[in-house]
Amino acid sequence: VDEVLRAVWTRFLPDDPPGLALVAVGGYGRSELLPHSDIDILLLHQNDALQLHRTALEQFTAFGWDIGLEVGQSVRTIEDCAQEAAKDITVITNLLEARQLTGDPRLIQEMQAALTPDKVWPVRAFFEAKKAEQAARYRKYDDTGYKLEPNVKESPGGLRDIHTVAWVARRQFGSGTLTDLRERGFLTKQECDELFAGQDFLWRVRFALHMITGRRQDRLLFDHQIKVGELFGYIDNDRNRAVEQFMQLYYRTIKSLSCLNDLLLQLFEEAILGSDELLQVSPLNARFQRRGQYIEAVDDEVFRRAPWALLEIFHLLQLHPKLEGIRAQTLRMILRDSRLLDDGVRRDVRARSLFIEMFREGRGLTRNLRRMNRYGVLGRYLPAFGKIVGLMQYDLFHTLTVDEHVLYVVRNTRRFMMQRFADELPFAHEVVKRLPKPELLYLGALFHDMAKGRGGDHSELGADEAKTFCLDHGLSHADADLVAWLVRQHLMMSLTAQKQDVSDPQVIATFAGKVGERSRLDYLFLLTCADIRATNPALWNSWRESLLTELYNTTARALDRGLSNPLREDELVAEVKAEARQLLVDLGETVDGIDEVWARFDADYFLRHTPDELAWHFPALRAVSPASMPLVLVKTLPERGTSVFIYTLDRDHLFGLSTGVLARLGLNILDARLHTTHDGHVLDTYVVAETDNRPIDPGVRFPEITEQLRKVLSDPETSTVSVNRRVPHRLKHFDT
């Protein structure tokens, strides 16, 4: 590209006039071009030269486009560059990477002289702006690079993290290559090699994306992951698909790059923002001290003398929440010495005590585990966890890698304990107060998916590992059994609530028998809620919450009565009727009038609807006549979502037509309860939501739903419903 642009320049400006220069900037200035990258150039000029050669420059630009170069061009004087750079961090960043292509060499030298730190963007201000820019970029990606469709360039741990380090180094030292940083002592040889290897890997991934898509593409979408994995030579094996193996390498690479980004920015901060001599130092214990707002080891050999201190430093961070992080040199020691966490250290009572104490402490646990994972300590101490680091779950539901998902589940269990998050799940916030040992819930969360990716039943394998871990770490047999049971059964409550009829007394009796006692029900309910919420934000809604809460409450009643005295159907029906009857009497209905309407329906109707729903249905059911059918009611019920109730004569195709109408209206059907009466009518209830989980607008959508259903169900024999819903791109890659 350099040679092409120089040739085009020479064609239209053969005399190479003074006062004009062609300069590469941005990624092109860094000499980082991929097949479909933007080619960013700067036409640097003096005012009189631009006027003299305007026509030739316009021809140069037009010809570049004509021959297929995707050129992004700016035209500026040196004064323009200085003014724009002073106002915008992105402009100064772009110009830092300026590289002369052809033309008057004096101009780029004068521009660089006008942009030195003593004139615009002092080193400290530049560094702080770049840190803020990176933090904002991280927030855009929810502070994780481990989502299942990452951006190779912009996600945390991506190429932009390497660029950020280079920009800060260039601003501070005048040169920003990795080799320069190594020569200046900011990088060890191993760190430099890791950065080069990670950068090369991500470049190759981006190159593959450009070749596969035929355009600029930086996101590793599901469409492309399989093809890129094939280009990298991966094939399916007994345990993991090729795409999962490739993506695990990707996630582990960005994890390494993210650690090095942390390390280098911390080193820069210490070098740029102040002298160590000015920071107050106070001892924390014989191995660690506080320097300013950071923790550091007292010398370079701490972890080699006491490898268990690799856990102690994180425990100290947990005990001293005002500490902002780990000093750079100590972080470098952690990255260097984490390999010392071998079987001997894992058996050391000091290591075991420190690790389990983090869970008993509770406060700061999530942040600590994330740090330990980020710096490789968690996977070293728990080899089973190390195996799931970066492991993707190529399915319709999970949005994070297994290790990130597990840590989000731990986070959710911790949030149940915190008053400031009580409004997220008020019922769970109340249940968690009854736990005698919350640390057992956190351990269940940590181990619940730790055996994924090995083949076999991950719940069974994980339960065995959890029990061994708990006993090794000094927990009682009863506590170890509880954690193992939680891991083994962590899917049971979700599957029961979503795939079985929780209004059926037999379902409740069976589930209660498997749970056995109220305390286990509390733990399992909380783990289930935390797990679903961490799997995919779109999976959690008021309907699922209500199902789990209903299952919890009915099971709690069954356990309180005793497993030998299960709830009977007639008792449940009588209770529901009594509560609904009271609601209606309070509204002015008579008992005889209520019972007369209800006589048309059998027990299933009362078992499958709440008292509030029965009270809502009643006035319409009392007034309905053959001429007014089909009866269609729509209402948003507290904590259950939007309910659509249909009452009409039983005829063929009603279910297909009803669901077809709802699908055509762009609604997701979350639940369907279908009931046929003994006198030939149907009572069908659907719980629906917008596809993006937005609340359904009563003013617009309720009349639309009612009108469309009544229109189609009025003549089901001749009605047809065609549904043509766009399939989200993610679903196209799975068998559904």
Describe each model-derived feature in a short phrase.
Residues 31-56, 183, 195-197, 201-203, ...:
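Divalent metal-dependent catalytic cores for phosphoryl transfer on phosphate-bearing substrates
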Residues 2-24, 31-33, 37-398, 467:
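Non-catalytic interface/linker regions that flank or bridge core catalytic/transmembrane domains
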Residues 68-73, 82-85, 338-359, 414-420, ...:
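Conserved catalytic alpha/beta cores of large enzymes that bind or transform nucleotide phosphates
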Residues 88-91, 494-497, 690-697:
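Short, charged/polar, Gly/Pro-enriched secondary-structure boundary elements
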Residues 201-202, 241-295, 367, 506, ...:
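Regulatory modules associated with amino-acid/nitrogen control
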Residues 3-16, 21-23, 168-183, 399-441, ...:
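Alpha-helical phosphate/pyrophosphate-handling elements in metalloenzyme active cores
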Residues 1, 38, 64, 162, ...:
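Conserved structural-core and active-site-/substrate-pathway-adjacent residues in large, well-folded domains
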